[in-house]
Amino acid sequence: MNSAFRILYECDQYRLYSIYENVYLKNIHRSESDNDIIVASVYGDPDSGLISFGNDYVAIAGCGITIHFLNGDEGYEIGTEADNVFWTEGIYQSGEDDFKYVRFTAYTDV
């Protein structure tokens, strides 16, 4: 196995994993790797990631925050622009949260 391969999150239907800076989503009920989709490229490698409780979106921490919607809607990135970078880590979703919220720790060296 590739030493750069990291599983960021896994649920009943999906596995979120990275190889270096690229983050992929795999439907674990399909064996073919060509069905894996790239959901983000994170400068400096991703720190952590999650798949929302309802399997609606993927959230990735590292250089900023990346949100990728699984229904095909356009995702977005926050804090990834060269003039506005912030570093995030430890992204998670609490059982006490509404399904649309995630929590993370942010650090910016100014």
Where are these regions (language model features)?
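Repeated scaffold domains used in trafficking and secretory/extracellular systems
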Residues: 1-14, 20, 37-55, 80-99, ...
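A short local loop/turn or secondary-structure capping micro-motif enriched for an aromatic residue
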Residues: 67-69, 76-77, 84-86
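Small/flexible residues
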Residues: 8, 17, 28-32
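Structural motif
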Residues: 19-27, 63-71, 108-110
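Short coil turn/linker residues within repeat-based beta-strand modules
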Residues: 30-33, 72-75
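Extracytoplasmic/lumenal domain signature
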Residues: 14, 32, 103-110
